[in-house]
């Protein structure tokens, strides 16, 4: 596979910036229990190749933002090994947001799929040799 171009990397970054909150809420809702940051990062990675788009350190600002917005609760607990851990749990407001965002994502995905598939591609990309 050819190396990714700068504009593709930029596109992925912008796309993931908008979707990271949705994914993190979904992971916590599916877990049904509180999780600390590294656990959440491992769960995202376990979702498949898409998890590779997330850099582990990049989830922490999103978790803090979701917490500040009231979509997550958090608490800090001392750890037997290493620094204290911050545990996150989805709130009822977070579950409502997740439900709303899933609907918005479904609508957006259908719109984009329709735009990409409508009438087929008029120009095919031909990579240079």
Predicted features along the sequence, with ranges:
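Amphipathic alpha-helical dimerization/coiled-coil segments
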Residues: 96-129
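Short, hydrophobic-biased segments on the C-terminal half of alpha helices
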Residues: 60-64
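N-terminal helix-turn-helix DNA-binding core of bacterial DNA-binding proteins
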Residues: 13-58
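Glycine-centered, phosphate/nucleic-acid-interacting loop/turn motifs that mediate DNA/RNA or nucleotide
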Residues: 70
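Short beta-strand "wing" residues that participate in macromolecule-binding interfaces
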Residues: 74
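Basic, amphipathic "hinge/linker" alpha-helix immediately C-terminal to the N-terminal HTH DNA-binding motif
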Residues: 80, 84-102
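Intrinsically disordered, low-complexity serine/threonine- and proline-rich regulatory segments
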Residues: 1-19
């Amino acid at each position: 596979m050819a190396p990714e171009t700068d504009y593709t990397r930029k596109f992925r970054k912008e796309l993931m910036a908008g979707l990271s909150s949705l994914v993190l809420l979904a992971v916590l809702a599916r877990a049904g229990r509180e999780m600390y940051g590294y656990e959440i990062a491992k769960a995202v990675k376990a979702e498949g190749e898409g998890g590779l788009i997330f850099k582990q350190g990049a989830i922490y600002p999103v978790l803090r933002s979701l917490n500040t917005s009231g979509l997550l609760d958090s608490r800090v607990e001392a750890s037997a090994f290493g620094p204290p851990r911050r545990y996150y749990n989805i709130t009822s407001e977070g579950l409502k947001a997740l439900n709303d965002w899933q609907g918005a994502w479904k609508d957006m995905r259908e719109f984009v799929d329709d735009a990409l598939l409508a009438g087929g591609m008029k120009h095919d990309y031909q990579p240079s040799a």
